[in-house]
């Protein structure tokens, strides 16, 4: 028995115990060593006997027996002959499963180039030989000769010769040289390469060359050569002489009835290769004419190509039904390939699916499971119980009992199911809450019952949705399901940390109705001794639910010792609120209940319960809330009738007023006062405003009603109109929807997004006429089409995000960095968009937080900022905090818990082993379907409103100007002469309240540090033109301003004033091309004036289109405009919004017209212009001048002689994240991407924590480009993982060498996924062929660090509960190394202590769970 166990262990050991997977090129000897024999014939199986043919593709002698322990001829049967080889048929007697693992081979009569290394770009063979792919193909497909041995001739090695040239050369030199064609020639060339020498040569070339392109080319080739040297691959192995044959059971041939066969396409492809190979062998034996042999060799090459990757070269080989045959490459790539179909997504046994329906009486941790399903799913457990109880003697008997459905079976089912959690899953599973565990309750009927509160997490509704059930079988799985996946453990959303178990719809309506107030309700003013009495009064009809009464309320407050102190007060409240208080858990304040509860308030209730009282209380409270809500929703009798939609009386007059305005615009248009575009924009504006007014009138009408109070006076109260209540409570519907019911439908959009200018003035209550209905359908159909596209796009975005972030796991507690991001509240204009509290909650402080204006430490560094500490920050009005971030985390291959902060779904510091990458990807991807696909067209009307021209302050406070330069004009106002000036208003505590961007040339009435009062306008500017501001006072002197050459004079017809307009260089006559129109300022004597405190002349170069309204010699004062440059009013600008915008940001795509940023700090000047471009020069204080060519049509934001800082915007446009990273660093680019992504999500009202976006940004930044390599293993210009460089630099520092210099690089998520260290992960994502080719040539090793690789090789993932398992495996490896050195006896003793199995892993899990509980 012991031996048998040992034997079984030995069999299973081989596949389990590895830590690295290496991929490489197979040498011919290696292929032969795998093989169990050569396949010589193309036959498959005998069609009469169905036995495999000998030496054929299914040969039993090569691949193993067809039946278990039985040879082909039947001489040896049974287990006792195990391992015998039959002398008659040559088959080894063993299990038939060896037919899945034994390979064969084909000896090719002529070498064949492997198509992957030839055609997968860049071509590896081409790169190695330094030849173009076209030439190599000509040689391979027998069109040209190539010289392999030049000998003493003047031919060169690798030179191509045509047929004629070859014959000439043969005549001249006879046998001096050697030239061949076909794969043999390429093989000879590859064999003859001396890789080391070639590397040396390239290194020297790299030192000498200066041209960038050459360097790139050499580096590429050098990298490939070095990879070959290091990996031990030989270049000639890229040309195959032996072809491996896949085991037959992996390319099955199945006989169908009727004598036909269903076969895998691979068999056809192999047959083709064998046929051609055998024919070629025969031709070579016969010494056939060259041309025939060549043709056969070419056909062999083509058939091998088709087998490996059909359709990569030439037309794909098709089968009988004219569809291309599925080659080996097709087997592994794509959604149906091996990776995605079989390794990453498997079907699961013990599962079922059914329709879901509501289970309003369930507890949160329960679900209703139909008896029929349960019986089927829990079969093995029932069999075991029946046998152990003695009801059945054998499994067969038990099976019969279950099939007969005996009465006893149901009792046992109930017993088995007790406390055995099951998993429910609703597709699509967009985030981890899409699979949760519940305890099953057996029910009659055939639908699964689901608890209403988890619907939000599953995104489920009961209109026919289906859900799948899975049964966790092992004890470990049940434990995990209960401890980690139970619905009661998933109260908070991992995306933002808010409760996800929030009542909606009926429950909200019930609670809202219950907590409303009513003026002069029955029983108003009663005094009641406690909520029980209030309920009694309500039940007996003494008082209405909404009546205002006084009730004695007893609250419980936690004291220092953690016990509850009772506190009773007489409170003004309503009957309903008092009744609701009866379900409140101890420790909640009554103030939260004493209000009209809408959806937001209820969410806050549950959140408070969770934070104050912990998980268990919060869950029980949520359940009670739900039961109460349902009960009172039923009592309320809310329903919708057509009379509830009250149309405001004002509607008709608003509409007729709008129609008059439109008619007026139309007249103006016809008399030519406004353009067609302006007319269209104005009309749309008028209707939009009218619609708003109707909506407002309607809401005023609906939301209030007048009643008579107890004193007999009229009083307004919130209306009890059903439609209003539903919208107001947040149960269903919104003001916009009510507007369509009772106001007017308003403007509709065409499918292309533009707006139809005739609005629908009717609403749904009045009904639409045919035209109005038709207009409605127009835009509505587009909405439906969009939704379908959106779902696919959103899913693809999620897939890319998961792929890029999948290997990011919390691996240590603290990396010890002092770096971090500085968080400040997000303020746009005069209002705070996101308060500081939201940004830092759940983060860890990177530095001590000081009390503003003192040195007193409020919060020490490395403290997790929770709700209480955030209150401290608010109380002390701290307005910027430096917090740790994953982007600045120093951990290699992972992140640390401190840099991540709070686990949002649990509320404490995150545990080690948590897969934060996947959580981040799910949190960003899941709301993707809610984002729009729209591209927003902003027309003239909307953009006119967007162009501000002044700053009006909303708060009283102090003005602060950032990077501002200005001059003071004679009215002692400031005129800005700097570009990106920011103006902020701070309050008495120094907190920033408002934030504005102010353009060049703006006139400020208050300076830096001055006080302002609310409502004051402190800055003005002209939005349509940019002035050129004089910085000194003096007299104007025109230089190169020559009428007709460089400028033209224009006279305004209305005012009669004339002005000078500078011409664009392109429009000028030849004589004026090199002139530079300039305004110079001189003093009264005509001497040059210099700018204050500099030696720069006060002269202003005028760009094209500039308008000068001064005359030569005019006097100007400081701060006066010398000229104006019209800002082209940009027409309709498309703003990419929604999902495409998020995808663009994460893909780090460059926008069409990116902003141009200054590469260095210095003084701007302009050099010689070329045909379409201007030359911009920036001269720094010391060092090289930087120059850049800029297209003329780009509007520049700088004048000649102006000082710019590195990273300043020179020409407006969308900023490129790559530029931001290069010029302003990692923090700036993180901030940019986080803010831009958040803008899109905020617009849709989706809340996502910044952390998740930062996680993705970290993954986008994981590569670096080496700028100075010194004597390290890296090449300059090579792309390497940042972690690798850091590790090397640490070693170099220890050795006292200079560190390798590098620049961080930003990769889009697709690129980053493909550039990951793990080739398995990259291959299973996209471009499988390219990834595998690259990896094989380089002999890459996959350390199996990420989650995906481990799933693919079938291991526990190194995250969550598998984290401990992997750490232990690591420990054992170290122990094994020690053990190997010890003697045999000691080994046995130690091995007993260190055996880690999956069972141990589960023990570890239990340990971890206990730790987690303690932490909570």
Curated annotation (Swiss-Prot):
Residues the record lists as binding Zn(2+) 2: 815, 889, 896, 899
The keyword Transferase belongs to this UniProt entry's keyword annotation: yes
Enzyme Commission code(s) on record: 2.7.7.6
Reaction it catalyzes: RNA(n) + a ribonucleoside 5'-triphosphate = RNA(n+1) + diphosphate
GO annotation, cellular component aspect: DNA-directed RNA polymerase complex
Molecular function GO labels: DNA binding; DNA-directed RNA polymerase activity; magnesium ion binding; zinc ion binding
Role, per record: DNA-dependent RNA polymerase catalyzes the transcription of DNA into RNA using the four ribonucleoside triphosphates as substrates.
Quaternary structure (record): The RNAP catalytic core consists of 2 alpha, 1 beta, 1 beta' and 1 omega subunit. When a sigma factor is associated with the core the holoenzyme is formed, which can initiate transcription.
NCBIfam families: rpoC_TIGR (TIGR02386)
Cofactor note: Binds 1 Mg(2+) ion per subunit. Binds 2 Zn(2+) ions per subunit.
Family affiliation: Belongs to the RNA polymerase beta' chain family.
Organism for this UniProt entry: Haemophilus influenzae (strain PittGG)
Residues the entry annotates as binding Zn(2+) 1: 71, 73, 86, 89
Name of the protein described by the UniProt record: DNA-directed RNA polymerase subunit beta'
Cofactor: Mg(2+); Zn(2+)
């Amino acid at each position: 028995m012991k031996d048998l166990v040992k034997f079984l262990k030995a069999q299973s050991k081989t596949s389990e115990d590895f830590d690295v997977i290496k991929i490489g090129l197979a040498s011919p000897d290696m292929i032969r060593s795998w093989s169990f024999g050569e396949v010589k014939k193309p036959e498959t199986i005998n069609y009469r006997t169905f036995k495999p043919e000998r030496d054929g593709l299914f040969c039993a002698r090569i691949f193993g027996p067809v039946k278990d322990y039985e040879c082909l001829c039947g001489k040896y049967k049974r287990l006792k002959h195990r391992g015998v080889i039959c002398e008659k048929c040559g088959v080894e007697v063993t299990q038939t499963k060896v037919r899945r693992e034994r390979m064969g081979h084909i000896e090719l009569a002529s070498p064949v180039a492997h198509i992957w290394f030839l055609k997968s770009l860049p071509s590896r063979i081409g790169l190695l030989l330094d030849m173009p792919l076209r030439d190599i193909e000509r040689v391979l497909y027998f069109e040209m000769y190539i010289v392999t041995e030049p000998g003493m001739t003047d031919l060169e090695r690798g030179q191509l010769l045509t047929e004629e040239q070859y014959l000439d050369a043969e005549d001249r030199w006879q046998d001096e040289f050697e030239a061949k064609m076909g794969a043999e020639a390429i093989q000879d060339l590859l064999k003859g390469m001396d890789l080391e020498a070639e590397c040396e040569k390239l290194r020297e070339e790299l030192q000498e060359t200066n041209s960038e392109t050459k360097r790139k080319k050499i580096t590429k080739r050098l990298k490939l050569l070095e990879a070959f040297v290091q990996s031990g691959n030989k270049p000639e192995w890229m040309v195959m002489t032996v072809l491996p044959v896949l085991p037959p059971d992996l390319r099955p041939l199945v006989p169908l009835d009727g004598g036909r066969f269903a076969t895998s396409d691979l068999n056809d492809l192999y047959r083709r290769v064998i046929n051609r190979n055998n024919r070629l062998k025969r031709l070579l034996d016969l010494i056939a004419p060259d041309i025939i042999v060549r043709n056969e060799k070419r056909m062999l090459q083509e058939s091998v190509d088709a087998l490996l990757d059909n359709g990569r070269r030439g037309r794909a080989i098709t089968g009988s039904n004219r569809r291309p045959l599925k080659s080996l490459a097709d087997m592994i790539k794509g959604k149906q390939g091996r990776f995605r179909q079989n390794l990453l997504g498997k079907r699961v046994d013990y599962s079922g699916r059914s329709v879901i329906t509501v289970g309003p009486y369930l507890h949160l941790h329960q679900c209703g499971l139909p008896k029929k399903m349960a019986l089927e799913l829990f079969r093995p457990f029932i069999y075991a119980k029946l046998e152990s109880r003695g009801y059945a003697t054998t499994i067969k008997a038990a099976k019969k009992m279950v099939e007969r459905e005996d009465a006893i079976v149901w009792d046992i089912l109930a017993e088995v199911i007790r406390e055995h959690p099951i998993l429910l899953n609703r597709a699509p599973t967009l985030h981890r809450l899409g699979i949760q565990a519940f305890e099953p309750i057996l029910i009659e009927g055939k639908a699964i019952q689901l608890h209403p509160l988890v619907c939000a997490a599953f995104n489920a509704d009961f209109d026919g949705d289906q859900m799948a059930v899975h049964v966790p079988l092992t004890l470990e799985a049940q434990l995990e399901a209960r401890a980690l996946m139970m619905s009661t453990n998933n109260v908070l959303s991992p995306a933002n940390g808010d409760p996800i178990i929030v009542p909606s719809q009926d429950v909200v309506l019930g609670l809202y109705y219950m907590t409303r107030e009513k003026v002069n309700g029955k029983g108003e003013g009663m005094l009641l001794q406690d909520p029980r009495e209030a309920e009694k009064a309500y039940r007996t009809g003494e008082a209405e639910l909404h009546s205002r009464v006084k009730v004695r309320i007893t609250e419980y407050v936690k004291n220092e010792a953690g016990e509850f102190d009772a506190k009773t007060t007489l409170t003004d409240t309503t009957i309903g609120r008092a009744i609701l208080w009866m379900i409140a858990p101890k420790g909640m304040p009554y103030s939260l209940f004493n209000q009209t509860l809408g959806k937001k308030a209820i969410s806050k209730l549950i959140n408070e319960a969770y934070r104050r009282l912990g998980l268990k209380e919060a869950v029980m409270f949520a359940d009670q809330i739900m039961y109460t809500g349902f009960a009172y929703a039923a009592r309320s009798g809310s329903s919708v009738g057509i009379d509830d939609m009250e149309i405001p009386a004002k509607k008709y007059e608003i509409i007729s007023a709008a129609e008059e305005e439109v008619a007026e615009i139309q007249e103006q248009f016809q008399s030519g006062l406004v353009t067609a575009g302006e007319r269209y924009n104005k009309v749309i504006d008028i209707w939009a405003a009218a619609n708003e007014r109707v909506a407002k009138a309607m809401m005023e009408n609906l939301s209030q009603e007048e009643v008579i109070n107890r004193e007999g006076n009229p009083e307004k109260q919130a209306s009890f109109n059903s439609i209003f209540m539903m919208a107001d409570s947040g149960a269903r519907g919104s003001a916009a929807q009510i507007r369509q019911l009772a106001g007017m439908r308003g403007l509709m959009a065409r499918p292309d997004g533009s707006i139809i200018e005739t609005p629908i003035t009717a609403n749904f209550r009045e009904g639409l006429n045919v035209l109005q209905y038709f207009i409605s359908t127009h835009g509505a159909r587009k909405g439906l089409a969009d939704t379908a596209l959106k779902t696919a796009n959103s899913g693809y975005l999620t897939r890319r995000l998961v792929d890029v972030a999948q290997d990011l796991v919390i691996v240590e507690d603290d990396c010890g960095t002092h770096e971090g991001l500085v968080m400040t509240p997000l303020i746009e204009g005069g209002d705070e968009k996101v308060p500081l509290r939201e940004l830092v909650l759940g983060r860890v402080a990177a530095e001590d937080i000081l009390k503003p204006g003192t040195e007193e430490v409020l919060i020490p560094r490395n403290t997790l900022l929770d709700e209480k500490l955030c209150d401290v920050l608010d109380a002390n009005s701290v307005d910027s905090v430096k917090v740790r971030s994953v982007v600045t985390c120093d951990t290699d291959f992972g992140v640390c818990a401190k840099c991540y902060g709070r686990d949002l779904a649990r509320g404490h510091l995150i545990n080690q082993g948590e897969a934060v990458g996947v959580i981040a990807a799910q949190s960003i991807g899941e709301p993707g379907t809610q984002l729009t696909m729209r591209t927003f067209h902003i027309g003239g009307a909307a953009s006119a409103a967007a162009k501000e021209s002044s700053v009006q302050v909303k708060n009283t406070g102090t003005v602060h100007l950032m990077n501002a330069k200005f001059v003071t004009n004679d009215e002692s106002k400031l005129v800005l002469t700097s570009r990106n000036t920011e103006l902020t208003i701070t309050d008495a505590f120094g907190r920033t309240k408002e934030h504005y961007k102010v353009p060049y040339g703006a006139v400020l009435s208050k300076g830096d540090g001055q006080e302002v009062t609310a409502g004051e306008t402190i800055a003005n500017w002209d939005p349509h033109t940019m002035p050129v501001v004089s910085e000194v006072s003096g007299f104007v002197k025109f230089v190169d301003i020559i009428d007709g050459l460089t400028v033209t004079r224009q006279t305004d017809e209305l005012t009669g004033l004339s002005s000078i307009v500078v011409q664009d260089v392109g429009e000028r006559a030849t004589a004026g091309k090199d002139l530079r129109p300039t305004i110079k300022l001189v003093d009264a004597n005509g001497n040059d004036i210099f700018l204050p405190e500099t030696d720069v002349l006060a002269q202003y170069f005028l760009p094209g289109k500039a308008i000068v309204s001064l005359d030569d010699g005019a006097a100007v004062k400081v701060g006066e405009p010398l000229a104006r440059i019209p800002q082209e009013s940009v027409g309709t600008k498309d703003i990419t919004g929604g999902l495409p915008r998020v995808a663009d940001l994460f893909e780090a795509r460059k926008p069409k017209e990116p902003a141009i940023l200054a590469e260095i700090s210095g003084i701007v000047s302009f050099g010689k212009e070329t045909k379409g471009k201007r030359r911009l020069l920036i001269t720094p204080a010391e060092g090289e001048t930087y120059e850049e060519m800029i297209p003329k049509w780009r509007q520049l934001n700088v004048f000649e002689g102006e000082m710019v800082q590195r990273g300043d915007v020179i020409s407006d446009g969308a900023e490129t994240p790559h530029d931001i990273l290069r010029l302003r660093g990692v923090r700036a680019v993180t901030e940019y991407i986080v803010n831009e992504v958040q803008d899109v999500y905020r617009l849709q009202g989706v809340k996502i924590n910044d952390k998740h976006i930062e996680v993705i940004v970290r993954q986008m930044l994981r590569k670096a480009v080496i700028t100075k390599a010194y004597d390290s293993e890296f090449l300059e210009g090579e792309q390497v993982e940042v972690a690798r460089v850091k590790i090397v630099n640490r070693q170099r520092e220890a050795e006292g060498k200079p560190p390798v210099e590098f620049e961080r690089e930003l990769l889009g998520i697709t690129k980053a996924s493909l550039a990951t260290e793990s080739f398995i992960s990259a291959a299973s994502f996209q471009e499988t062929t390219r990834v595998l080719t690259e990896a094989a040539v380089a002999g890459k090793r996959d350390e199996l660090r990420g989650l995906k690789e481990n799933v693919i090789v079938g291991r526990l993932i190194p995250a969550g509960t598998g984290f401990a398992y992997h750490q232990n495996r690591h420990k054992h490896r170290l122990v094994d190394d020690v053990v190997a050195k010890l003697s045999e006896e000691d080994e046995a003793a130690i091995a007993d202590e260190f055996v880690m199995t999956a069972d141990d892993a589960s023990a570890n899990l239990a340990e971890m769970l206990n730790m987690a509980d303690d932490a909570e």
